[in-house]
């Protein structure tokens, strides 16, 4: 899972993808990481919420982990907290 900054984020979301906003100190974020690694249907990126505070404000991130799926540059679905693989795959139901 590639860690991206705010600049890379802007170009990454132009393709269908999943972005996880998380931190290094967050227990649920650490638990979620291996599950995110199993998603192969679309690119999965990680944004460090501590380093990219302005991006978190822009996207209304109030809790980590927050996982957002993007389709054609727009937010499609959002989940907060540790998730199962099946819940993550439900975020991708836009016909990939």
Language-model features and meaning:
Residues 1-11:
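N-terminal "domain-start" segment that seeds a small globular fold
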Residues 11, 58-59:
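Short amphipathic alpha-helix with an adjacent loop that forms part of the alpha/beta core around
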Residues 59-68:
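Structural micro-motif
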Residues 9-14, 33-42, 92:
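Alpha-helix C-terminal capping segments
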Residues 2-4, 21, 33-55, 61:
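Thiol-based oxidoreductase modules, predominantly thioredoxin-like and allied folds used
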Residues 69-96:
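Non-catalytic, surface beta->alpha helical segment in thiol-disulfide oxidoreductase systems
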Residues 26-29:
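Short cysteine clusters
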Residues 13-23:
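Short active-site neighborhood of thiol/selenol oxidoreductases, capturing the structured segment around
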